[in-house]
Amino acid sequence: MYALVDCNNFFVSCERAFQPELEGRPVVVLSNNDGCVVARSNESKAMGIKMGTPFFKVRYLVEQGRLVVRSSNYTLYGDLSARVMSLLAEAAPRLEVYSIDEAYMDMDGVAPERIPGICSALVTRIRRWTGIPVSIGIADTKTLAKVANHFAKKYKGYRGVCVIDSEEKILKALALTPIKEVWGIGRRGAPKLESVGVKTALDFIKRPCEWVRGMMGIGGVRTWSELQGRRMVEDERDEKRKSICTSRSFDKMVTDIDEMTLRVSDFAGKCAEKLRSDGTASYSVGVFIQTNRFRDDLPQYFPNASVRLDVPANSTQEVVAAALRALRMVFRNGFEYKRAGVTVSDIVEADAIQTTLFDFDQEARDRDDRISKVMDLVNTSGKNLLRLATQRPGHYSDGIRREFCSRLYSTSWSDLLEIK
């Protein structure tokens, strides 16, 4: 069986773990640059605040003292996520980390009657050791585990753990699950199904397989089968990323090539680090730059370009150099740029790289690889302690507005809580 562990309102829960005075109060967490709402407490949901709501629309609630707001603190969230995942890894034979706040525990080999007890103990242990509340859904397939998790989270009577382990439970749960809430269907596919009378997950599985294939394609058939208890979604732990993107919106418009070079070099360097961390390399490096689409009073420009490498690369020097070549292809003066990003794609295993017959740069490439490894080692002690000249120093402001950011309670000596 699968047990899906989902941290409840994760970003908000991280803030509350070190600020207990926020318990019971409406809280939202904002995106980069304090742009819009990306996480909500149950209390703020009850106020009608939607995901993606621009901050300026709810700022008056903050000023009236009716809402607490926090800027995104990804260092804190990442550290608490790692702590939660380490506890799960101790309890599960196999663990697949799905996102920063979700993970599947593959419980095959564990006696079915023991699984609910193990999961109930985990809910208590994680809350006690990290301060993070979690919900766990248990079922034979990943999609049904998602359904079970929804019930565990929504209904307090489950005490954080819901098990769907019989046909009777499956049918009852699916009848209560709107089609738009089904993993693999979502809000894009739901209107199409609702228009032909498929309102719930139970309505969906009652349709013939060929009908589902015609409406939703092979992906829909997988979901249809999973909802009936047949495993179709495989373990994705060993799958490598097909592409990696690092991008950011700027708090101030960028207008000159020198400043944009610093930004793009940073993004490309981060992509290279992720490639090396995954043990992969990339054939293609792309860059996009964008003006502010919401500023009708300014000229608009949304170009992108990519550079194809003869030999796949993951060294910071090569990836940054390719990204800057792409940047020079698209950058134009006279525009005010709000956002930029770097994407590496056509990714292969690093140890499977084959050089070309006339590759005369292999010696330089080997040197770059050695330098990148040294950079990775040194930079474990601090951000950008060792960097390229085109990258920004570690103390340089990243240009992100964080007006309401909390402290780095778990990763910085100077931000540790004091007990008096």
Question: Where do the PLM segments sit?
Answer:
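C-terminal hydrophobic structural anchor segments
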Residues: 324-381, 386-387
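Gly/Gly-Pro- and Ser/Thr-rich, intrinsically disordered tail segments characteristic of DNA damage-repair
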Residues: 1-225, 235, 362-420
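Short, well-ordered strand-loop elements centered on a beta-strand within folded domains, enriched
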Residues: 36-38, 160-162, 298-303, 352-355
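Short Gly/Ser/Thr- and Asp/Glu-enriched loop/turn motifs at secondary-structure junctions
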Residues: 98-102, 139-142, 280-284, 335-339
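Short, hydrophobic beta-strand segments
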Residues: 103-109, 304-310, 354-359
